[in-house]
């Protein structure tokens, strides 16, 4: 049985993950952490009576030992949470976005120093991970590519972590084959009309109520276009990826970025 604790347990994503952890037969939720709901009964918050768990403010208040901590909070909170967990020699699965490259280098050092493991994934939807892998294959033949990502209007950061990861993967693949994306635009009549850029790859962000999380990678070629799109229709789509990450991270040591690190289970 893998013992887990959950940071951001009472948030929108946290409640969905909490229910899934409780329902899993090989995983046990032993700690629910959320400073905004300190002292409340977690079973009442998520509407499940299978457990009796009091929400605590921080990991320092936990009485139970654990194997894996899961974080879906914000970048500022996650930074402190991750450091504490890794320093304890415990494993970590992180879905929080907005973490900087400098932070990740620090986490990598902590994981190695404490002989533990951390996975940071911009997206836990298996369909989104496969979308990136498919796009990696396509860009060899269609190097003219742009990314459109669409999210709910409460998302704080833009572009999304998934869009950035997609662009990074495509950039590296294009470098490998010495490919370039041609863009003749010289005048933007409105600043930012062509979106943000990661090297030569344009990323366009849409924020609207009614959306959840969506991304389209559009490739253009002579007389044709090819689009790869993923739509997250509810937060439940992330659950299979989160559970897979929890089950796999206990077998690993080191720093991992992106759920694709765990897709080939035979390598674990």
From Swiss-Prot:
Binding-site residues for NAD(+), renumbered to this chain: 8-13, 34, 95-97, 121-124
The family database entries (Pfam families) matched by this protein are listed as: DapB_C, DapB_N
> Does the UniProt entry include the keyword Protein biosynthesis?
no
Q: What is its EC number?
A: 1.17.1.8
**Iron as UniProt keyword:** no
GO CC annotations on file: cytosol
Residues recorded as binding (S)-2,3,4,5-tetrahydrodipicolinate, renumbered to this chain, are 152, 161-162
The active site annotation covers 151 (proton donor/acceptor), 155 (proton donor)
**Pathway stated in the Swiss-Prot or TrEMBL entry:** Amino-acid biosynthesis; L-lysine biosynthesis via DAP pathway; (S)-tetrahydrodipicolinate from L-aspartate: step 4/4
Q: Which reaction does it catalyse?
A: (S)-2,3,4,5-tetrahydrodipicolinate + NAD(+) + H2O = (2S,4S)-4-hydroxy-2,3,4,5-tetrahydrodipicolinate + NADH + H(+); (S)-2,3,4,5-tetrahydrodipicolinate + NADP(+) + H2O = (2S,4S)-4-hydroxy-2,3,4,5-tetrahydrodipicolinate + NADPH + H(+)
Q: Name one GO molecular function term.
A: 4-hydroxy-tetrahydrodipicolinate reductase
Q: Which InterPro entries match?
A: DapB_C (IPR022663), DapB_N (IPR000846), DapB_N_CS (IPR022664), DHDPR_bac (IPR023940), NAD(P)-bd_dom_sf (IPR036291)
The Gene Ontology biological process annotation of the record reads: diaminopimelate biosynthetic process; lysine biosynthetic process via diaminopimelate
Keywords, ordered alphabetically:
Amino-acid biosynthesis, Cytoplasm, Diaminopimelate biosynthesis, Lysine biosynthesis, NAD, NADP, Oxidoreductase
Task: State the compartments where it is located.
Answer: Cytoplasm
What is the recorded function of this protein according to its Swiss-Prot or TrEMBL entry?
Catalyzes the conversion of 4-hydroxy-tetrahydrodipicolinate (HTPA) to tetrahydrodipicolinate.
| PANTHER family per the UniProt record, alphabetical | 4-HYDROXY-TETRAHYDRODIPICOLINATE REDUCTASE 1, CHLOROPLASTIC-RELATED, DIHYDRODIPICOLINATE REDUCTASE
Which family, according to the similarity comment?
Answer: Belongs to the DapB family.
Entry protein name: 4-hydroxy-tetrahydrodipicolinate reductase
Q: Which organism is it from?
A: Dictyoglomus turgidum (strain DSM 6724 / Z-1310)
């Amino acid at each position: 049985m893998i013992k887990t604790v959950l940071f951001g347990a009472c948030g929108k994503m946290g409640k969905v993950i909490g229910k899934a952890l409780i329902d899993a037969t090989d995983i046990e939720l032993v700690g629910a952490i959320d400073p905004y709901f300190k002292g409340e009964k977690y079973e009442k918050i998520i509407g499940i009576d299978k457990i009796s768990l009091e929400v605590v403010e921080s990991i320092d208040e936990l009485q139970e030992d654990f194997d894996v901590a899961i974080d879906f909070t914000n970048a500022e909170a996650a930074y402190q949470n991750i450091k504490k967990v890794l320093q304890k020699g415990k494993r970590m699965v992180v879905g929080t976005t907005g973490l900087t490259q400098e932070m990740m280098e620090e986490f990598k050092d902590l994981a190695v120093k404490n002989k533990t493991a951390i996975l940071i994934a911009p997206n836990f939807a298996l369909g989104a991970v496969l979308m990136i892998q498919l796009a990696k294959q396509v860009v060899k033949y269609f190097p003219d590519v742009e990314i459109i990502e669409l999210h709910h209007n409460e998302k704080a950061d833009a572009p999304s972590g998934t869009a950035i990861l997609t662009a990074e993967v495509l950039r590296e693949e294009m470098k490998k084959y010495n490919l370039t994306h041609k863009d003749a635009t010289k005048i933007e009549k409105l600043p930012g009309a062509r979106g943000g850029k990661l090297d030569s790859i344009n990323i366009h962000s849409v924020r609207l109520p009614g959306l959840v999380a969506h991304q389209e990678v559009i490739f253009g070629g002579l007389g044709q276009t090819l689009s790869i799109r993923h739509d997250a229709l509810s937060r439940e789509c992330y659950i299979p990826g989160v559970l897979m990450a929890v089950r796999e991270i206990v077998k690993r040591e080191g720093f991992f970025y992106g759920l694709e690190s765990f897709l080939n289970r035979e390598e674990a």
